[in-house]
Amino acid sequence: MATTEADILAREAAHPTAPPVVEFRRVSKRYDNGMGLDDASFTVGRGEFVFLVGSTGSGKSTVMRLLIKELEPTSGTIRVAGRDLAEITRKKVPFFRRNLGVVFQDYKLLPNRTVHDNVAYALQVTGSSRKEVRAKVPDILRLTGLSTKLHHFPDQLSGGEQQRVSVARAFVNHPPLLLADEPTGNLDPETSIGIMQLLYRINRTGTTVIVATHDSAMVDRMRRRVIELSRGRIIRDEVSGLYAQRDMSTAEFGELLREPAPEPRRVREPGDEFDEAFRD
């Protein structure tokens, strides 16, 4: 079920002093070949963990690119931590992005720098002192299980280890918002579990985490909030949701049909059995 503008206003009224970390209000993005996002409205509160799900082309990546100001909306309002992104000039976009953590499917590591230096770079570009770098980098490497790899270069690491470096770099500044676009897309199931556990630990520190993913098993396992998109529209916004909205499966329905029908104890109306079969 999509979030309506009335839902947004109700949430704001319930928490008047805590603006949402992310707010989309009637946001649309039109491309030359169609709508990437169509009249989308939702909010994400401080400390939430949210999955964006949907098929390829559903609008997940458009949401992520809008959030980092890689794209501008055709219409509507986007706010991050209460700040209207339309007010951020192109010159100030790099400064805005430094307050976000972003994890990509393809890692985007600096190939000629070690694990330590890849993570330290995220601090250096924000003006952190050498003392801060020396204090923060070892801590984040311990959190991400990379303490023994700090002198390795990216080509000496497995895919899962490279993604851990990407997560460490995104989180070393302790951003209020971390965005992960298909973070397990190139990883095997066991490694994917490790990455999602890491993102969950980060979320437990208070950072809001939004993950765009096709990993249905992971979404079903974690049971966090799910926002589902289809053809640019939000079609479901569910707390503790599954990857796909769960109806009775074909197998379950087949089992139901194989059960012997009980003797009726009252006059049945047409369709009663089907009503009960699909009732929660």
Regions found by a protein language model. Name each.
Residues 153-157, 161-163:
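Conserved ABC ATPase signature
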